């Protein structure tokens, strides 16, 4: 998260103090044989730079009631909204956020989270009860498509999954609990 404009606040923009020339930095790493993957998530925070645009254009599904925050940045409940991948305009908006990064030379996006959505939100294309498991597939598909379009290689670094996600490589089994229940 050290690349974020604001620590732990995903706005799909580099911190200008740490990275005054992100494109130059990425290109310098590339010349040394490194490839850059950036961590991000599919939720927009209340104080994110994009919140007004996201709400105005229905890029995040509007909530039907006020959510109680858990006080951390590790749950959809802590964010103002979930990007609505059932809405094509929201998907294109998200792809545009990633395209800006990929155009700088980023080669892979870590599509973290996606296993939780706001269950009290009004998604344009599907009821939340049906979308809940399918969400990871739609999320990874969007990131995969724009990555393939820009870089020529369709690679994402995904954690959450649902049937069909295997067509959008690569997946890792991280963040699982070290318990018998966590392995279920």
Task: Describe each PLM feature range.
Residues 1-184:
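Catalytic-domain carbohydrate-binding cleft regions of carbohydrate-active enzymes
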